[in-house]
């Protein structure tokens, strides 16, 4: 569990465009022009994490990048919280509670890589035969305030299994 302690203001994570990692769905998405891999910035990254609770934090990701424009198509995707399922089969019991996520300045054009306040997605496992399908069982989001985030507020996004849905 990650939680505040004591009294006073919430502990604050100010990522400022740092926390850079590489997202890769493991193959093209449903349209060849959709972005399926690339670098992005997250304040909190839960990568193949389960049985975890993140509570009572203030989270921002508002970088100071010289000459970066809001309408710039190649602007970096940014999140407050990214949750990724990939190499551990079914991920259980992920709780986000009483988070104040704001001023996450992502890419307004890209809706495929994680981008926004809270964003969850599923990537192709390195060895699906061994791990099973990557998925979630028990996502709980309670009492979170998400504001001034680009592109999404809270989203359960793309999956490498997109072709199974019609």
Range-by-range predicted roles:
Residues 1-70, 103-109:
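Right-handed parallel beta-helix/beta-spiral solenoid domain characteristic of secreted/periplasmic
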Residues 6, 94, 111-113:
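A generic structural signal for short, non-catalytic loop/turn and secondary-structure boundary residues
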